[in-house]
Amino acid sequence: MTILKKIMLLGVGLIVLSCQQTKKATFLILPTPQQSTVGEQFSSIAPENLVMAYSPTKDALPNLFDFTKTLQETENESQAQVSFQINKELDLPEQGYFLDITDQRIIIEAKDDAGLFYGFVTLDQIAEDASLQGVNLPIAQIKDYPELSYRSIHWDVKHHLDKETYYYDLIDNMARQKINGVILEIEDKLKYQTHPEIGSADAFSSSQWLAISEYAMERHISISPLVQGLGHASFILKHPTYFELRDNPQSDWAFNPLNQKTYEVQFDLYDEALAITPHGKYLHVGGDEVKTTGRNSGQSALELQLYWLNKVAKYAQQQNRIPIFWDDMPLKEAALMDPIYNTSISNAEVDSIWNANEPKLNAFLDKFPKNCIYMRWNYHTPQTYGNQKAMEWFIKNDLQVMGATAGQTRWTLMPLRESNIDNIKTFAINSIKGNLSGLLLTLWDDDSPHFELYKRGIGAFAEYTWAGDKSTKEEYKSLFRHRTFGPQWKNENFAFIDSLEAPVGAWVNALVVDKSHRNSLKKNNNAKEQLLITLPNANQKGEWAERYAARLSNAKKHYEQTSTNAKKMEMLIEGGAKNEFMIEVYQQVLKLTHFSFETLLLLEQYDKATSEKEVQEAMENIMKQRTKFNLLRNELETVYAQTRILNKPENYILDQDHHRHPANQTINFDWQFYSELLFLDKIEEHFKNQSPFNEGQSKTKLELQ
């Protein structure tokens, strides 16, 4: 090679290096590392050149994702871009790791297998950011470990299953965020061999669930089962075979804890649930929201609950599992629940209540099993002094305690309250300060939003349980957009989830009379007349619009707001944002809310119409709503069905629905649209006598199931 050519090549190299060094790029990791220095300089390693990995200690590569998945092990150190090893002597907590990106080499050193896995997870996020922004990997030094050792997500499958492949996708998604546990509320979604009538016809087999458990464990996620025992037992007690085990013969809610056959059934179900979750550490036995009498035995509800708890705790111990028990009923029986949720009382008042009522708990202290974890669940007010007092009572009495926060409680259609980020963060920080071992994020299936809509809350849980108080709420939201949609979408200008909350919150009861709720419609045989709002009267023009003026004003505001949100979502999709399916699910949420507001505004137009032409046009537009809705429903179901099983089996037995769970009110997917379907029926019945009904319109009626 001539000197001139060498000089020219060197010049080109310097120009390329200069471009690399001056180009701006943003690297954000979820969860945020404990210590991180990501400089403005870039290495010589392009993300697509991550090809070979070398371990001086002969450790095996962990399971890898996306941009690190192409790595292959080599015994030739000089060939490797990545050097990795496990060093149990590292001065780091368990699951910790060091990640060092130099100009020519990436070095990962981990405390244990989990730490090695998490080190590569972080590298993968960095490589993805580099690829999306067209730069090499940055020069970086990271020291990282979790603040809470157990960071678990609740999978509640009681009212529906998702497609089997989706659970594998969810495991990958959680593992990428360093979540390491799942509590699987299995109910009737396992084909039980000992009690086959309990398993739903669409339940997964034991081999299917076992395969999911094994896949999760390979990604450092241990799955433990939750099988409700004392209360919330409708999935068992609705079947005639088990009527004799009911505490109240007329109710399918709770077992009789004094009937020894209760334990024969429960232990059979436990056996099978434990078999499909062999890597789990826990057996969650539930036990919340239940008050039994033992068929009028004369024993108190607290005595009976502790009798049951000791029986199941002993079983768990024999199976080498730690039982977890929802702690609300002992606190409620001792009149100590109000200070937990009452944010208006002073600390002194809380102390006074505890001084008066704590002896009621202490009287039963010797009956609280010591091998049990008492799960202090609080989804709305974890910051209260009363909540802390409750947790401290367990700790000072040498009882194990763990918290439970929520990413989904009883919100309809999608989680609200900014995905409950504030409460998730508060409980995580309090758990860290209290030196607790872990925290659970509950995701209740009662109202059954699509799981994609939980992911911002899951990300917040991952962030604050791992990193602690390192990001504000707004910083986390930006981090979520960065990691979920891509670095170019992290700016607040592209945020759309929060601005959906007000329309969704208003949509819930937009068509329902005041002081009622759409979840109660199915319980009322005359809901169409009694619980839905009235319709305009042709002989009393303007009266309807005046009566519902506030409702219509809100409908107009939210109609316009959803139109703005629709443009933002479309912009993200057209711009190539990642996770397009999540955006599509949010689009369906938006379209459903938009429809209800549009229907109200069309009714207002009819009520205010003065000329015959205006009246006729308004009625025609109203009558088109059924066809519009059918198209909307079909589109929503098509999107949701990509991952979700929409309908229950035809032979499924619906239970008594004690807590108004809409997802358990119909066999098919009608429950999701019950208010809209009923309202459309009411509209058609109301208007067909006022003007000739267009026979070309769909007359599909709500099929009550």
Model-derived features with residue positions:
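Acidic, contiguous N-terminal accessory segments
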Residues: 19-114, 118, 122-142, 325-330, ...
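Substrate-binding groove of N-acetylhexosamine-processing glycoside hydrolases
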Residues: 29-45, 211-214, 263-271, 275, ...
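Short aromatic/hydrophobic-glycine micro-motifs
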Residues: 69-73, 179, 221, 321, ...
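Bacterial Sec-dependent N-terminal signal peptides
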Residues: 1-28
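Conformational gate/switch positions in structured elements
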Residues: 10, 15, 113-114, 436, ...
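Short, solvent-exposed amphipathic alpha-helical segments in soluble enzyme
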Residues: 66-71, 124-125, 170, 390-399
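A short, charged/proline- and glycine-enriched loop
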Residues: 45-49, 146-151, 370
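Feature activates predominantly on carbohydrate-active enzymes
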Residues: 90-96, 101-317, 324, 402-405, ...
